[in-house]
Amino acid sequence: AWKDYTVECDIKFMAAGNYPGGIRTYVDAKTGGHYAVWFYPPTKTIKLYSGTVFDINGGIVTLGEHVGVPYDAKEDVFYYVKVIHEGKQIEVWFGKSKDKAEKIIEADDNAFKSGLFAFDGYNQPVHFDNILITGPGIPRSDGEAVESQDKLAIAWGILKSNKISK
């Protein structure tokens, strides 16, 4: 499993109701234990959680939260989010774009020392784009971006096959 990694992406919520989702890091594939950055548009709040199971409602502890600027909770607008893990330190960066991001949450926790990454949609449409995961032992990709609209799953299989055979 990966450890000491950074994940960054653009995230867009299509509705401004509560519980749209966010991203999870250091996900334990067996137990569901994880860290999660979740968004709450009605209160313009972003929270960093530690959770013990796959269900976001079970066993969560709030490690930090940020309310307000720069999160204005607009619908159909991409925001930039980045989570950095280094040892037990966790940082959450957020902004209207990558070059305008600022550190909004910082926490120390060692409940999870490594794990997978996951997108986390709950009860509303969430769009993710420009995903980048970097860190020790994570292979770099030379990128083979493809517009997914109106593509069959076979297109992704061909890309993967071509990538493996290189």
What is each of the regions a protein language model found here?
Residues E102-L132:
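Flexible glycan-contacting loops in extracellular carbohydrate-active proteins
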Residues G33, I56-V67, K98-E106, S141:
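Surface-exposed loop/edge segments in extracytoplasmic proteins
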